[in-house]
Amino acid sequence: MGQSEAMGRLWMTWSIDGVGSAGQNVADVEAACRALVGSVERSRRAFDTPEPWEELRAAALLLQDRILGSGRETLDQGRKWASTLSGLSILLIPRE
């Protein structure tokens, strides 16, 4: 799975509208996806009805595809990558 040095460590921040934001170091884009989707899964209790959370979860799964595609390509070039979709925002920054 030939990952470059830039992919070895990432700083990740994300925010969920109406819920909060967080940041952490992750090993690679796959770990970033797990952290993002896991955070959205845990946010379910913050919603009174299932519909907003289901939309948020769908957005997280779409963002996961973006992270594994254009996100990986951008980070491989040593550049930061960000995306926002339906109340969910993420920023990934390569660390040395």
Predicted regions and their residues:
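A short, exposed loop/beta-hairpin motif centered on an aromatic-Gly-Thr core
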Residues: V19-R34
